From Swiss-Prot:
Record-given protein name: RING finger protein 141
Zn finger (RING-type) start-end: 154-191
Coiled-coil regions, chain positions: none
Organism: Gallus gallus
Classification via Pfam families: zf-C3HC4_3
Keyword Metal-binding on entry: yes
Database matches in InterPro entries: RING-HC_RNF141, RNF141-like, Znf_RING, Znf_RING/FYVE/PHD, Znf_RING_CS
Gene3D superfamilies: Zinc/RING finger domain, C3HC4 (zinc finger)
GO annotation, biological process: protein autoubiquitination
Gene that this sequence comes from: RNF141
Record GO terms (molecular function): ubiquitin-protein transferase activity; zinc ion binding
Length: 230
């Protein structure tokens, strides 16, 4: 019985449109990513892009925006700064700021593209020329990708409705979809993290600000433990 259900689930997944499947994969990966794994990916991306840009005038530098990862809800507020730097002059030619979803998306794109080229460079002298030709314009190409529209404002369920609510696990939904889901479940539709009530979510107009998050944490603290008496 279990094998039959698993087979049916896989069949459904295989029939999903490519965009939906990719989006679902990125959302799931962002949700389960630990802080240590996140920092490791930032370091890995810097290492990969440095290798690809060897001998070139420009390279990319990824770094976590100071203070943006200090919250318990770092997945929601963390920001990664991507900077394109001229090696010769040291001048910063362009900078972009990414949220976690955008970073994971770019990480997968860059590492998948780089894997083949870097593998060849370890086994063939001819790959050095290939590496040079690929890396010459990659900094500009990848930086350009950051300017393209993303799905960060789309509901994780229908991928159409505007985000109205964000759970502590950083997954976001439109009100219509989450209302239907919460009628029968008390968990996140994506990662299945338990949600005990309305206090476990943000209702947002655009995106949660640091003030929104601070207020949420303060309200949460008010409900924990007992008042401290002198």
């Amino acid at each position: 019985m279990g094998q039959q259900i698993s087979s049916q689930t896989q069949t459904v997944m295989n029939k999903l449109p490519e965009k939906v499947a990719k989006h679902a994969s990125l959302v799931q990966e962002s949700g389960f990513l630990t802080y240590e794994e996140f920092l490791g990916r930032v370091a890995e991306l810097n290492d990969v892009t440095a290798k690809l840009a060897s001998g070139q005038e420009k390279h990319l530098l990824f770094e976590v925006q100071p203070g943006s990862d200090s919250s318990a809800f770092w997945k929601v507020v963390v920001r990664i700064i991507c900077t394109k730097i001229n090696k010769t002059s040291g001048i910063v030619e362009a900078s972009r700021i990414l949220n976690l979803y955008q970073f994971v998306q770019l990480y997968k794109d860059i590492t998948s593209q780089a894997a083949g080229v870097l593998a060849q460079s370890e086994t063939s002298e001819e790959a050095a020329e290939s590496l040079t030709s690929v890396s010459s314009s990659q900094a500009s190409l990848w930086m350009g990708r950051l300017k393209q529209p993303t799905d960060e404002d789309e509901c994780c369920i229908c991928m159409d409705g505007r985000v109205d609510l964000i759970l502590p696990c950083a997954h976001s939904f439109c009100q219509k979809c989450i209302d239907k889901w919460s009628d029968r479940h008390r968990s996140c539709p994506v990662c299945r993290r338990q949600v005990t009530g309305a206090g476990d979510s943000w209702v947002v107009s655009d995106a949660p600000t640091e003030d929104d998050i601070a207020t949420y944490i303060l309200n949460m603290v008010d409900e924990v433990g007992q008042p401290l008496r002198p």
